[in-house]
């Protein structure tokens, strides 16, 4: 299974649409958003994902997602949010995945070393990072799709069969 991992879109319409186009072209099976969509109107851009992908579109909220109720009502029509909105535990492609916008590094390391999850996904720092622990656990921050802080607009694609990931730059 191929999973696109996006974070920190911050309402950047052009980059969201460009990422959606790449995701559709590459026949990605699922999308996970690690938070900071920002406004509920982003739904109209993510709505351009292929129907088969929208069935596997999951996300958590970030610290800049102030309109959580509206995001859940609007974007929630195509994106599945966890009950608390902040942390998601899901199984996709036979892999157990933990998603949170801004866990502390110590928490990421504890989760990785516990081997309770195969993949740990985060956002918030806007810095892209792929780390593979000795036990095979992947910890990924896809960077920022918006490109506002680093000047790099990025997201990640995970191949769950190979248990590897690469960063896509727009």
Residue ranges and their predicted role:
Residues 2-91:
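Core catalytic region of metal-dependent phosphoesterases/phosphodiesterases
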Residues 2-10, 94-102, 138-143, 167:
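Active-site-proximal beta-strand elements of phosphoester/diester hydrolases
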Residues 10-14, 38-41, 64-70, 104-109, ...:
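Active-site environment of divalent metal-dependent phosphoester hydrolases
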Residues 32, 58-60, 119-121, 138-140, ...:
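Hydrophobic/aromatic beta-strand patches that form the interior of the parallel beta-sheet core
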Residues 41, 59-62, 110, 160, ...:
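Metal-centered catalytic cores of metalloenzymes
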Residues 66-75, 112, 137-143:
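Short Pro/Gly-enriched beta-strand edge/turn motifs at strand-loop
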Residues 84-93, 115-116, 133-170:
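Binuclear metal-dependent phosphoesterase catalytic core
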Residues 85-125:
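Internal catalytic-core helix/loop-beta-alpha segment
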